[in-house]
Amino acid sequence: MRPTHWSSNQCEVDFTAEALTTLSLSNRNHEEDPIQPVLKNSNLFLLNRDIWSLIINYLDAFDILRLMHSSRQFYYWLRKSAVDECCFNNNFLNLQPYQRTVPVASDLEWATEVDLYGNPPILKLQLRDSFVWSMLAKFQGLQTIALDGTGVTISSVTNILLNIPTVKTLSIRWCVGVCSLSLIEFLQNSKSRTFSLENLYVLGVKGLELLKPVLLDGSEDDTLTSNWHSRVILFQNALDALPTTHGNPVECDISRCPLNACKIAGQETELADLFSLQKVPACIYCLREWKKPICRYCIDLRSCLVCDSFVCPSCISLDFDLQIQAFARQHRVISTLGVVYPEREDSCFHKIKAAQWHQISPRSLLFQFQEQNHIHHKKIRRKLLAAGWKWPQSQI
């Protein structure tokens, strides 16, 4: 029987330990349970870094990058910790970001296949320029080269782009030896050459890292710094001006939002979120999927909270964003109001700003917002039908 002073924290520890143990047994059949070292080091609670170290091997690239955007502590922990391996699925960004570029017999440390996941682990920082230069002859003919997490510098990147004309996808994410200014200078000085490069992934290089990750709810408090934003502009302009054989600009995982709604709302430093765009359904009007980069704030403005439909910018312009922008801001305030100030009347700062909030609870306000948004959505639907839009039978 448990003692009377048994705290609720211990119950949470037991619940978390049981859940993590079940997760580890369902994904791996190790002889040793990975939960035991953590429980020995923590008496009454599990630290965030302890939980992260347990579940990091069971997350794919999508989950890891979403955690980096939502938790600043997880971002810095991931940068400082020595993570040996992570599970990256093959559906990330519609390609295989971690492909075996060199036969295993050449260098086991470079491309060791993990039998459990079927993908090689994250590359080590010990792999530097000298090793890449020695392998340039074996890189000939490759179309995808992933140097994520290695200790290479800008010289290796330039040698690969200049000496391997067949490369179409180059990934140098989290290469701390690569400086953004050197990369921008190389792109600006290479306008006289033509490259076959189609994709360039640079998230995490020095100068282009996430200094302040934006929260999932699009909070206006954690915006990116102006210096970071100016480097993104220079890098994107230099990348767009790079001549290519296919005639299209090189796609990158770092980009700005092209719409103006986030800039009007004070979100001019908002980044385009390619991962949230993967979850966005097709446009309810033109039935086309929006492929261009768009920030999380503009996605929220163009998504109906009632029917989960999405309106692309090509169907309805900025006027649609401005009409429901007030509803979106009200929703963010109300959704957090019940957590920060649960059913408190006079102590809330937002309730002091509006007299009607003294008599309406946060839940009632949230319900009122959803009703207003639903009415607004029905009005727009009637206007578009009157203007000649052909509505799908499944959506009527």
From Swiss-Prot:
Residue ranges the record marks as coiled coil: none
GO process annotations (BP): protein ubiquitination; ubiquitin-dependent protein catabolic process
Localization in the cell: Cytoplasm
Pathway: Protein modification; protein ubiquitination
UniProt keyword annotation of Transport present: no
Domain F-box as annotated: residue spans: 40-89
Keywords carried by this UniProt record: Cytoplasm, Ubl conjugation pathway
One GO CC term on file: cytosol
A single MF term (Gene Ontology): ubiquitin-like ligase-substrate adaptor activity
Record has Transferase as a keyword: no
Pfam families for the chain: F-box (PF00646)
Quaternary organization: Part of a SCF (SKP1-cullin-F-box) protein ligase complex. Interacts with skp1.
Name listed for the protein in its UniProt record: F-box protein pof13
Species whose genome carries this gene: Schizosaccharomyces pombe (strain 972 / ATCC 24843) (Fission yeast)
Lineage per the UniProt record: Eukaryota, Fungi, Dikarya, Ascomycota, Taphrinomycotina
